[in-house]
């Protein structure tokens, strides 16, 4: 099988790029020849540009084109739109990382023009995005119906995607986020209990709630809280860690100081991927206190999961999560617990529960380790091969559907 993968890839720093790198390796191990035609290309920001880019390439040499859709990225979405109109096209597939929508962001010319105006106030841009949303949703549904197969990482995400995109249930496969195969490391000594926030550090991840919850535990039960340490770790890309109000990191550090937590909070920033397992496994528990954007809620329900949670599972560690996204499903296997997002008192109670009954940590860790075996990337790759075979059976090429169209000039330039 020959597959063209449309996705960001490292060294680009985002969760989908990290996912795609492991995904590509798992497919290679399953015997799939993976091409990455978007690698090194400039972003594609219009359907006309996508059609021109697609027309230059001979897609007859590919069995499946699979895209990683998420993060509001346009290149992959627009390329799939262009490919969908090709005669005798290959099978088209996508992993939807942010269901219930495919892209969430407008793709029309007005939005492109407005979004490029640095002087335009952010509320004005958001108003344009909201007014453009009916057209965005129409484009998403059109592409979703044209795809031969879609993948979500959770059942929750699949259910929302099917409903919002108006798809047949059998068009969507659920394939859990793959887990790296890592050496088992037992939990560290239970005094102190070490909590870890791990992920990109920017507003919207609810890190403030975690700091406030630990502060609440300390204020109410100082002796109990003395057995607690918190590490805040992750990426700090300047475009997300700094904003109009200054450094977000400085704001978090000031919050830690106001809560009297400075001696109990450690910071590990811009962690190298090779060091992630060691970082996670020297902690007892990951805490992901995400909050959903109220503005995004005007457009729908985002029910994706998290690469950070996948790391916790791979490393054999439990998690306390908010009920944002599809987190409640991901820790419903006995590998953690959840609380209502934004409820600092509920999060503080969860932390107190762990301090009072630390034996729960080993139970969560054991279940996480079992999940990691079930979701190992080599097995995940095989599941995707099955998904692609089903998509190929649905594709126009398999059904013998063909029509005349412009000849590709790709063979004159370079070969897939």
Segments the model singles out, each with a brief description of its role:
Residues 162, 178-192:
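Acidic anion/phosphate-binding donor-loop and adjacent secondary structure
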Residues 280-303, 317:
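Acidic donor-binding loop of glycosyltransferase active sites
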Residues 188-205, 211-214, 230-233:
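Conserved donor-binding/catalytic core segment of Leloir-type glycosyltransferases
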Residues 353, 360-374, 386:
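A short, well-ordered alpha-helix in the C-terminal region of glycosyltransferases
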Residues 333-344, 352-359, 373:
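Conserved acidic donor-binding segment of nucleotide-sugar-dependent glycosyltransferases
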Residues 311-314, 318-321:
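Short hydrophobic beta-strand element within catalytic cores of glycosyltransferases
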Residues 114-150:
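Membrane-proximal helix-turn-helix segments that form the acceptor-binding/catalytic region
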